[in-house]
């Protein structure tokens, strides 16, 4: 918020804070405009990728939307935090966020009164996994016409075979970290029955 106040002439921190947190405004058109501007700068170039990752923000208390005791990758442990899934368009050393989705744990979506107290819109009071949020980011980028050659994810997403298969089904090229104990085939395996050794079947 402070950086915005520094960049916007004749702005006031408290007024901006009130506008962003208490005024009724749609954030999606603003986020989509950022995606369009990023695409105009680096979209469509050879090597441009859409990176998907999550990040956690440590919190005290229980009032912030989506706050819960959950995995905080920044700290490497379970902690009271909010978690967001982010999409960034990047090529070499040029990268910028183009989308963000707040993860709502089931303890939030199973408690409509808590959601209402925190002003969570009814349309957002649905539990979606982080993998589903990642898919929403990818689909939204394609819907907006953002031009990228591939999707990049870390092991938290790359270890989900279902997620990778959904990317393949959508025709997406992807680069994914996987866990070290994941078995993979470098070529399509052919069905094989070992020969009988003459013993009992």
Model feature map: region roles:
Residues 1, 13, 27-35, 160:
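Alpha-helix initiation and N-capping motif
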Residues 1-23:
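Gly/serine-rich nucleotide phosphate-binding loop at the start of the catalytic core
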Residues 7, 41-44, 144, 169-170:
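Alpha-helix C-cap/termination motif
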């Amino acid at each position: 918020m402070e950086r915005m106040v520094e960049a916007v002439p004749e702005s006031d921190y408290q007024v901006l804070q009130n506008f962003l947190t208490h005024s009724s405004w749609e954030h999606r058109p603003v986020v989509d405009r950022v995606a369009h501007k990023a695409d105009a700068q680096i979209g469509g170039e050879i090597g441009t990728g859409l990176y998907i990752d999550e990040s956690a923000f440590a919190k005290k208390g229980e009032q912030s939307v989506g706050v819960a005791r959950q995995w905080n990758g920044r700290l490497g442990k379970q902690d009271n935090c909010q978690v967001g899934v982010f999409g960034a368009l990047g090529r070499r050393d040029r990268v910028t966020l183009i989308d963000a989705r707040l993860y709502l744990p089931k303890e939030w979506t199973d408690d409509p009164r808590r959601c209402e107290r925190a002003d969570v819109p009814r349309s957002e009071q649905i539990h979606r996994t982080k993998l589903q949020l990642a898919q929403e980011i990818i689909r939204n980028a394609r819907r907006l016409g953002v031009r990228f050659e591939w999707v990049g994810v870390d092991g938290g997403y790359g270890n989900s075979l279902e997620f990778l298969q959904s990317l393949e089904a959508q025709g997406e090229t992807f680069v994914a970290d996987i866990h070290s104990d994941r078995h993979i085939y470098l070529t399509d395996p052919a069905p094989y029955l070992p020969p009988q050794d003459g013993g009992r079947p």
